[in-house]
């Protein structure tokens, strides 16, 4: 319900459950039934994640949507999911560094922070990462999706550590799940234009119409692929994955 009706927080959802008849009907509550405390969500979240309830729900949705999915043309992409950790929590692993000032805040001015020497005290698994040149480095993870190109439906999603190889490694893992038996295409942005990715995909009988990266080097995508009429179609279709990312972050509450 939070996602469908853009309810910004669990506390707000509980508040609306007290008077919203539609919400009460959705969860099977009687009109005069007491609403639970918002802390119940926090207590149950770990249990639901451990039991893979969300994954089970996702697979059932995929089963219903299967008639509308392409089995030939796909797209992979990744996006930065911010961690619930502030930049000020990203300190040296050895405990050294500038001492806290007034208010307990640490002054990082002039200090070069790297994942090799620093980590977040509140989320040690988060990594300082920037998705593209010129963008701000943030503490977070990388989210990865596999999309079919006919209607822009997502077939797979998962989260990894944020690092320079994560998107390409995730693409290979998702490519392995695409059913064989026919020749398929897997498009992506310039980040996937490497000899390693292109060769591995071709070894799986997958054509890689990924965007070419010609900056200071030669693209790994050959001319027969780029000249094919389907290349331009794949490039147009792959941009639909950005719509999924925008929805996930603006509506689906997955910005962090």
Label each region the model flagged.
Residues 1-7:
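Alpha-helical support elements that line or immediately flank enzyme active sites
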Residues 8-17:
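Short, charged amphipathic recognition helices of the HTH superfamily
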Residues 95-100, 106-107, 190-256:
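Helix-centered, glycine/charged polyanion-binding patches within enzymatic domains
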């Amino acid at each position: 319900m939070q996602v469908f009706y853009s309810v910004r927080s669990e506390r707000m959802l509980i508040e609306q459950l007290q008077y919203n008849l539609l919400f009460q009907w959705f969860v099977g509550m009687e009109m005069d039934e007491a609403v639970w405390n918002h802390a119940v969500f926090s207590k149950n979240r770990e249990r639901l994640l451990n039991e893979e309830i969300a994954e089970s729900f996702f697979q059932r949705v995929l089963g219903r949507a299967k008639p509308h999915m392409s089995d030939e043309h796909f797209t992979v992409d990744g996006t930065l999911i911010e961690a619930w950790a502030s930049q000020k929590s990203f300190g040296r692993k050895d405990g050294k560094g500038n001492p806290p000032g007034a208010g307990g805040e640490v002054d990082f001015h002039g200090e070069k922070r790297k994942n090799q020497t620093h980590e977040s005290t509140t989320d040690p698994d988060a990594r300082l990462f920037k998705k593209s040149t010129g963008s701000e480095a943030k503490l977070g993870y990388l989210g990865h999706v596999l999309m079919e190109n006919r209607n822009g439906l997502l077939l797979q999603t998962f989260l990894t550590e944020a690092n320079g190889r994560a998107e390409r490694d995730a693409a290979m893992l998702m490519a392995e799940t695409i059913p064989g038996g026919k020749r398929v295409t897997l498009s992506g942005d310039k980040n996937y234009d490497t000899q390693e990715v292109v060769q591995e995909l071709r070894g799986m009988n997958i054509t890689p119409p990924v965007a070419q990266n010609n900056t200071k080097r030669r693209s790994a995508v050959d001319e027969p692929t780029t000249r094919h009429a389907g290349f331009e179609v794949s490039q147009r279709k792959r941009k639909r994955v950005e719509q999924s990312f925008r929805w996930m972050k603006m509506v689906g509450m997955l910005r962090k």
